[in-house]
Design a protein with these regions (language model features):
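Early extracytoplasmic/lumenal segment of secretory-pathway proteins
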Residues: 30-97
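Conserved C-terminal helix/tail region of periplasmic/extracytoplasmic solute-binding proteins
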Residues: 342-377
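Mature extracytoplasmic/periplasmic domains
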Residues: 29, 283-351
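Ligand-binding "clamshell"
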Residues: 98-106, 134-136, 254-270
């Protein structure tokens, strides 16, 4: 099955391949005229890389888009630490995996801490997961988004969806009226929350049974199962379904930007983990601990903090996302009213306050086995 932008796994992925396959020479040399970034899509776009290349004439700037966080991590573990200068992943990996294994290195606080002052309040504190336990700055946050579920507000009001939360999909009246966007890892997290469980704590015994029951019901009563967000949005627009399980700003924004503002990402008002029922992904970009580093790495990381480049990062590749730099009035002014509406800026702060940080799912191996069996049946 084709891997999609947010369909990441929590298990180790065997890394294979030759470093030169991407056209990058791993041999040590003076590399201050080179910069290589391993990233989610967007940072590899011409709208982001083009201006940096123009600002650094003669530099060779390359980017490769990954398919999952663990896959990108395993590239570094397999020896590509000698290739990459920056890595862009979701929030738990820098502190929990990359830094403890010496795969990334601290950033210059004197250079980068002032940028937190210009970020949205949720990040200006500054954002805790950007730091190692010893206080080192290990990543800069930029793109983010609440990610729970999506409804057609012409059929299900925003207020009702937020009040009911995940229970909406357990209502017998919803049978055959919704789809499941099959981003497996996210489905597992969301089914845990639907079952009243904390997806980031160990799950066993009777709690496994709760998860199994919910997985079977959610998957069994769905009208559509697909990992294609365009197909899912189209099904909502065409009236085939009224909602879809697993989704948010990232998936709803293309349809909203095209005028279908009745398609809305929903974050439950309450949930089983400290009163929260939503989950938010936040990307961090970190400096790889390359033994032959390039000065262009931190130059690029500082470059993407600029208002116009932050806007380019937010609106690329056919999906649109908020960025932490929108706390800077100069950056916010780059977005017009339609763009702000597409990313649901009106409720972002509220949605964030109701959301848990995405973390590694503790019992993933057991839960994905249950999920997969329920999906096949």
């Amino acid at each position: 099955m084709k891997l999609t932008r947010r369909q990441f796994t929590n298990t180790a992925v065997a890394a294979t391949g030759v470093l030169t396959a991407s056209g990058i020479n791993p041999a040590f040399a003076s590399r201050n005229d080179q910069m290589n970034i391993l990233c989610w899509e967007g940072y590899n776009s011409d709208g982001v890389l083009g201006p940096f290349r123009k600002a650094n004439p003669g530099a060779t700037v390359r980017a490769e888009s990954g398919t999952s966080d663990p896959d990108m991590i395993n590239k570094l573990r397999a020896g590509e630490i000698n290739v990459w200068d920056l890595i862009n992943l979701n929030q738990p990996w820098a502190r929990d995996v990359l830094y403890p294994n010496n795969l990334i290195k601290p950033l210059d606080k004197g250079r980068f801490m002032p940028y937190f002052d210009k970020m949205l309040p949720e990040f200006a504190a500054p954002y805790p997961l950007a730091f190692a336990d010893n206080g080192d700055l290990i990543g800069m946050p930029q793109r983010y988004g609440p990610f729970s579920f999506v409804v057609n507000t012409d059929k299900i009001s925003r207020g009702m969806a937020e009040d009911e939360g995940w229970d909406l999909f357990l209502d017998s009246a919803m049978k055959g009226r919704y789809g499941v966007l099959t981003y497996d890892n996210w489905n597992v997290m969301h089914m845990c929350l639907t079952a009243g469980l904390n997806p980031f704590a160990p799950i066993s015994g009777s709690d496994e049974d709760k998860f199994r029951k919910v997985a079977e019901q959610i998957l069994g009563n769905a009208k559509i199962l697909t990992d294609d967000l365009v197909a899912m949005n189209t099904a909502v627009i065409n009236g085939e379904i009224d909602a879809y399980f697993t989704g948010g700003t990232y998936t709803a924004s293309p349809a909203r930007y095209d005028g279908a503002t009745n398609i809305r990402g929903i974050t439950p008002k309450s949930g089983p983990v400290n009163g929260k029922g939503g989950v938010v992904w936040i990307e961090l970009t970190s400096a790889v601990n390359n033994p032959d580093p390039s000065i262009l790495a931190e130059d690029f990381l500082e470059f993407v903090q600029q208002p116009d480049i932050s806007k380019a990062v937010a609106f690329v590749e056919g999906t649109y996302n908020p960025v932490s730099q929108m706390g800077d009035p100069k950056c916010l002014a780059m977005f017009d009213s339609e763009e702000l509406d597409a990313i649901q800026m009106d409720s972002l702060a509220e949605d964030m306050s109701r959301s848990l940080d995405y973390q590694v799912v503790s019992s993933y191996d057991k839960l994905i086995e249950i999920y997969t069996k329920a999906r096949r049946s």
